[in-house]
Swiss-Prot record:
Keywords: Ribonucleoprotein, Ribosomal protein, RNA-binding, rRNA-binding. Residues 1-23 are annotated as: Disordered. The keyword Endoplasmic reticulum does not apply. Transmembrane segments: none annotated. This is Small ribosomal subunit protein bS18. InterPro entries: Ribosomal_bS18 (IPR001648), Ribosomal_bS18_sf (IPR036870). One of its GO terms (biological process) is translation. GO terms for cellular component: ribonucleoprotein complex; ribosome. Residues 9-21 have a biased composition (Polar residues). SUPFAM superfamilies: Ribosomal protein S18. GO terms for molecular function: small ribosomal subunit rRNA binding; structural constituent of ribosome.
Length: 90
């Protein structure tokens, strides 16, 4: 008889994905994260070319950090520090 192979469970499949994404973290784990709505250069690191906020799974931020980032980006857009949409999409 052939030995039975283990099925890939969802939990096993996600382990390799989470390990790969952990290295993509744009902010150091030890660094205290503070997003200032006036810091245009720092906010633009987390916005793609269409003007959308990059999701957590790509940036590597925690839920709390992503929430602070989103709030800062939205407030900066409201105050016209950064544009809502990129120029080529207007």
């Amino acid at each position: 008889m052939k030995p039975m192979r283990q099925k890939n469970t969802r939990a096993q499949g996600n382990k390799s994905i989470s390990n790969a994404l952990a290295s993509k973290r744009k902010v150091s784990k030890n660094q205290v994260v503070f997003f200032d709505y006036r810091d245009e250069r720092k906010l633009k690191r987390f916005i793609n070319d269409q003007g959308k906020i990059i999701p957590r799974r790509i940036t590597g931020l925690t839920a709390k950090e992503q929430n602070l980032l989103t709030h800062s980006v939205k407030w900066a857009r409201f105050l016209a520090v950064i544009p809502y949409v990129a120029d080529e999409y207007k």
